[in-house]
Swiss-Prot record:
InterPro entries assigned to the protein according to its UniProt record, in alphabetical order: Fork_head_dom, FOX_domain-containing, TF_fork_head_CS_1, TF_fork_head_CS_2, WH-like_DNA-bd_sf, WH_DNA-bd_sf
SUPFAM superfamilies per record: Winged helix' DNA-binding domain
Short name of any one Pfam family annotated for the protein: Forkhead
Any single Gene Ontology cellular-component annotation: nucleus
UniProt-recorded name of the protein: Forkhead box protein D1
Localization annotation: Nucleus
DNA-binding region of this protein: 3-97
Protein's job: Transcription factor involved in regulation of gene expression in a variety of processes including formation of positional identity in the developing retina, regionalization of the optic chiasm, morphogenesis of the kidney, and neuralization of ectodermal cells. Involved in transcriptional activation of PGF and C3 genes.
A molecular function (GO) term: RNA polymerase II cis-regulatory region sequence-specific DNA binding
Keyword Hydrolase part of the UniProt annotation: no
GO biological process: axon guidance; branching involved in ureteric bud morphogenesis; canonical Wnt signaling pathway; dichotomous subdivision of terminal units involved in ureteric bud branching; kidney development; luteinizing hormone secretion; metanephric capsule development; metanephric capsule specification
PANTHER family found in the cross-reference section: FORKHEAD BOX PROTEIN, FORKHEAD BOX PROTEIN D4-LIKE 1
Alphabetic keyword roster: Developmental protein, DNA-binding, Nucleus, Transcription, Transcription regulation
Amino acid sequence: LVKPPYSYIALITMAILQSPKKRLTLSEICEFISGRFPYYREKFPAWQNSIRHNLSLNDCFVKIPREPGNPGKGNYWTLDPESADMFDNGSFLRRRKRFKR
């Protein structure tokens, strides 16, 4: 299997953008990636820490705590509204600029 040409930031962004509420948990992001890209299905779960690391490290991702009464594990992650133009012309292959909050 060939590794997809996308960065982890691009993969996370794709996952969040396709979700109805534009927010996902770490496990939902990983489910999207492994469901969409067979390469990551084979390598699971070695890359999950890389996803976690990128969520925490990059300002374009914002952590949203779970609402009280919403059971489940982990916080939600969404995109900072200011980072919408992070990818050139909607192409996930090339990031336009590093986003800083």
